[in-house]
Design a protein with these regions (language model features):
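PDZ-domain C-terminal substructure recognizer with occasional recognition of PDZ-binding tails
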Residues: 185-229
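Transmembrane alpha-helices of multi-pass inner-membrane enzymes
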Residues: 48-54, 258, 302-305, 317-318, ...
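Long extracytoplasmic/lumenal interhelical loops at the membrane interface
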Residues: 233, 346-360, 373-413, 434-436
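A conserved mid-to-late transmembrane alpha helix and its immediate loop/hinge
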Residues: 240-248, 394-432, 473
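A membrane-periplasm/extracellular boundary helix in multi-pass inner-membrane enzymes
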Residues: 129, 136, 140-146, 283-286, ...
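PDZ/PDZ-like domain segments forming the peptide/carboxylate-binding groove
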Residues: 144-180
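Hydrophobic transmembrane alpha-helices and their immediate junctions
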Residues: 260, 264, 272, 413-469
Length: 511
């Protein structure tokens, strides 16, 4: 009787373990599918997956925790981050930011729970396929356009008197979206002493103009009454996908583009339907990245692609790509000049000059006290103390962060934390280089021509390495480590490669 009860209990535990393990895998795929689109959905998948993983430890057999070369650096960096939070000028604010810092557990959720190399490959392809959805969305937005772009304006126009100029795209009036000039007329003819609030887009800015009502010109159609000489749909804004900001979108695209390039370089038969699909994805991601008009991410993409080609492609392929890149770079520079009215390296650009200002202020604050060098000022404590520290040109510049991973980490968490972060990236790069070599030198060529063959493993590693280097390069002028959407994709790639290393090492040990 006891044996039967014990057997029944073992069966129930076995079924529960299988259910939990499968549910964790589902969460991993939901994470990969949501990462290019929604921070809320991605973090929900992460939290549910983490909860299930913790519950899994309550059942026999207890999961084995596999060590990795990055464990000490990851945990040490988080510990130093926590220490800086508790010693912060604003402890409660900084401690609240530890939730974002705990996103590093994404690495372990993937690294410890992926059961096979096939799942690694499917997760990487899920990320790519899902990202194509926001590429189509971005293309659809451009095709449809938005608002009313003013092509010409008479001096006597009530819009001109309010400050509107040719080239502006009118988006909303009194909170209502504009689709055509008739929408303007309908609200400007209403008798009201209060002027209408007209929101517009002008070269990255969203000014609001106060337009007096009842000042329309005489005319037989809306354009004549508004003093507008011509209009079209606006298509000038910077693409942001489903995110709220174009920089987040650009940085995520850079990481996913690196994965795409890595897979294509590793693909044995490039003239195949798989090669065609990867080419389509590559062109789509490039299209969206260009529309973000984000110089640092463009440069990061070029750097990451160069690294991947040097490590994975032959000389002939590198030469061909190099020749193709030149016209693309020139076209990108022209597009940048047309859409943002700046050059790639432009000392007259406001975003460049105020970066230089906050870098100087941040460095001065960092070295002003030994405490700042050791443990930093604490995450987000600057929001409550920028006035007393005279930051952001005493409030005349946009208040936010230091626009550099290196300076931001040193200032908020201390120089030791920055050093450990650099060690983490260095160890990660070394691991990826060794894994690339191991996969290249392995004798496992069986199935290399299959859609889900071993070539994908090498492509993932090449993409992760290139993406990491591009991420670091872009982070010299962006604080992309503080962007959760970007960091989650970065940790996702790190988790995939750690899982792949574990599975490759296990196979090697068996042989």
């Amino acid at each position: 009787m006891n044996r039967r009860s014990s057997a029944a209990g073992d069966t129930e535990r076995s079924e529960a373990v299988q259910w939990i393990d499968r549910s964790i895998i589902v969460c991993l795929f939901l994470f990969a599918a949501a990462a290019p689109h929604s921070i809320a959905a991605t973090q929900t998948a992460w939290l549910i997956g983490m909860l299930l993983w913790v519950v899994r430890f309550a059942f026999y057999p207890v999961p084995v925790f596999h060590k990795s070369p990055l464990d000490y650096a990851l945990l040490g960096f988080f510990i130093l981050t926590g220490l800086s939070a508790f010693l912060s000028y604003e402890p409660m604010v900084s401690i609240g930011k530890l939730r974002a810092a705990s996103l590093f557990t994404i690495v372990y959720l993937f690294a410890q729970n992926i059961p096979s190399r096939r799942v690694v490959r499917l997760l990487a392809l899920t990320l790519l396929a899902s990202c194509m959805i926001n590429v189509l969305y971005t293309a659809g937005q451009r095709l449809v356009g938005r608002g009313v772009k003013i092509q010409g304006l008479t001096v006597g126009s009530p819009l001109y008197a309010a400050g509107v100029r040719p080239g502006d795209t009118l988006l909303e009036i009194d909170g209502q979206k504009l689709n055509d000039p008739e929408g303007l007329i309908n609200l400007l003819v209403i008798p009201n002493k209060q002027p209408a609030a007209l929101k517009a887009y002008r070269l990255e800015n969203f000014p609001t103009f106060k337009v007096e009502r009842g000042k329309l010109l005489a005319g037989s159609d809306p354009l004549e009454r508004l003093g507008v000489e011509g209009w079209s749909k606006g298509r000038d804004w910077r693409a942001s996908g489903f995110y709220g900001h174009y920089v987040s979108y650009a940085e995520v695209l850079q990481l996913i583009l690196a994965l795409t390039v890595g897979l294509f370089v590793a693909l044995p038969a490039k003239r195949s339907w798989i090669g065609a699909l990867l080419t389509i994805a590559f062109l789509g991601f490039c299209f969206s990245l260009v529309l973000t008009i984000t110089r640092a991410s463009w440069g990061a993409f070029l750097i990451s692609s160069t690294v991947i080609l040097l490590l994975g492609a032959g000389r002939r392929a590198i030469l061909i790509v190099g020749l193709l890149v030149v016209p693309l770079v020139l076209a990108g520079l022209f597009f940048l000049q047309q859409k943002r009215n700046v050059g790639f390296f432009d000392q007259t650009d406001n975003s460049t000059t105020w970066r230089q200002t906050v870098w100087r202020e941040g460095f001065d604050l960092l070295v002003s006290k030994p405490r700042h060098l050791l443990v930093g000022i604490g995450m987000d404590s600057m929001k409550g103390h920028w006035r007393e520290w005279g930051m952001f040109d005493n409030g005349r510049l946009p208040r936010g962060h230091m626009h550099s991973n290196l300076l931001q980490l040193a200032l908020e968490r201390g120089v030791p934390a920055l050093i450990l972060w650099l060690v983490l990236l260095g160890l990660y790069a070394v691991m990826l280089l060794r894994l690339t070599r191991d996969l290249r030198d392995s004798n496992d060529s069986r199935g290399s021509e299959q859609p889900l063959g071993p070539w994908i493993d090498r492509g993932i590693v090449l993409g992760a390495l290139g993406g990491m280097i591009g991420f670091f390069a872009s982070g010299l002028v962006h604080y992309n480590w503080g962007d959760s959407e970007v960091v989650m994709v970065f940790y996702f790639m790190m988790g995939l490669t750690l899982a792949l290393k574990r599975l490759v090492d296990l196979r090697t040990a068996k042989t």
